[in-house]
Amino acid sequence: MDFGALPPEVNSGRMYCGPGSAPMVAAASAWNGLAAELSVAAVGYERVITTLQTEEWLGPASTLMVEAVAPYVAWMRATAIQAEQAASQARAAAAAYETAFAAIVPPPLIAANRARLTSLVTHNVFGQNTASIAATEAQYAEMWAQDAMAMYGYAGSSATATKVTPFAPPPNTTSPSAAATQLSAVAKAAGTSAGAAQSAIAELIAHLPNTLLGLTSPLSSALTAAATPGWLEWFINWYLPISQLFYNTVGLPYFAIGIGNSLITSWRALGWIGPEAAEAAAAAPAAVGAAVGGTGPVSAGLGNAATIGKLSLPPNWAGASPSLAPTVGSASAPLVSDIVEQPEAGAAGNLLGGMPLAGSGTGMGGAGPRYGFRVTVMSRPPFAG
C-alpha cells in the first residue's frame, strides 16, 4: 500500500480508530503460556519414560513405547521454542505499533489545520492572508509526510514481526493401520469365542445322554475315552486330586478327635481320670504317711471276696458289678420289679464296663422249662394299689 498517496486524515484516522496494541500484547502472553505448558509437558514425558524404562517396565514393549513417544516429545520441545519466538514477535509488533502511533499526527491537529485554512481563504478578500495560507498549506504538507513516513516504518516493522515460522503437526505415535487391525482382531476373537462356546454346548448336549447312561455302570466304564468327552475327562482328572486333598484335609481334625475320645475313654476306664482318680490323688499323702509311720499292723482276710457264681471278684469290682437277678421260680425270687438302681451318671466306668454279662446266664439255671412254653410272671405295678 502506498501510504504517501493517502492524506494524513486517512492515515491518522486508521491508526487512532483501531484497537491499538492490546490484542498483540494479549497474543504475546498467550504464546508465552503455551510455550511454558509445552516445556513442562515435555519434561514430564521424559521423566515418566525414564522411570518406566529403568525401574518398572523393561523389555521389547518398553523399547517400542520409547521409540513411539520420543518423536512426540521432540515435537513438543520444538513447538515450545516456536511458541516463545511467536511471543517475541507479537511483542515486537506491539512495539512497532506504539512507535508508529507516537509518530502519527493526531487527527485533531489535522482538523484544526484544515479549519484555519478554510478561515484564511474565506477572509482573504484583498490578498492580505496569502502568506498565512501558504504557511498553513506547508504545515499540512509536513503532516502528510510525517504520517506517510510513520506508516511506512510501521508497515516494515510489522511485516518483520509477523513472520512466524509455520508450526509442524505432531507426529503419529501409533500405526495408521493399528485401529483397523485391532478392530479385526477383536471381531475375530469374539467370533472365535462365540463359535467355541456354541461348539462346547453342542458337544455337551450330544454326549450328555451317553454320560448319564454310563453312570448306571461302574465308574471305570463311564470314564473310558470312547464314551467320555475330552473336556469332561480333563475336568475329572483335575478335580479328583483336589477332592482327595480336600477330603484328607477336612477329615484330619475328625481323626484327631476320634483318637482323643478313644484315649479319654480308655483312661477313664482305667481310672486314670474322673472322680476315682481325684479321690486317689487326695488320699495319696495319707496313704504314704500311714505306710511310713507304721501305726497299725497289716491285716488280710481269706474267703471274703465277692463272688459271681464260683468266681471271686477283685475288690474294686464289687461296687461296679450288678446284682444277680434270681431265677424265675426259685424260692428267693419275690414277685417284685426286677429294676435295679443304675450307677450315677458322673461315675467313671472301668475297662470291663461293670460286667454287663453278669446276669446273662439266668435263663440256664433250670428254674423254668428249657423247651416249649415259658411261664412269665409279671409283678404288680405300683399304681395298681
Swiss-Prot record:
Q: Write down the superkingdom of origin.
A: Bacteria
List, alphabetically, the InterPro entries matched: PPE_C, PPE_dom, PPE_sf
Q: Which Gene3D superfamilies match?
A: PPE superfamily (1.20.1260.20)
Which Gene Ontology terms describe the biological processes this protein takes part in?
Answer: response to host immune response
Q: Which family does it belong to?
A: Belongs to the mycobacterial PPE family.
Q: What name does UniProt use for this protein?
A: Uncharacterized PPE family protein PPE22
Q: From which source organism is this entry? A: Mycobacterium tuberculosis (strain CDC 1551 / Oshkosh)
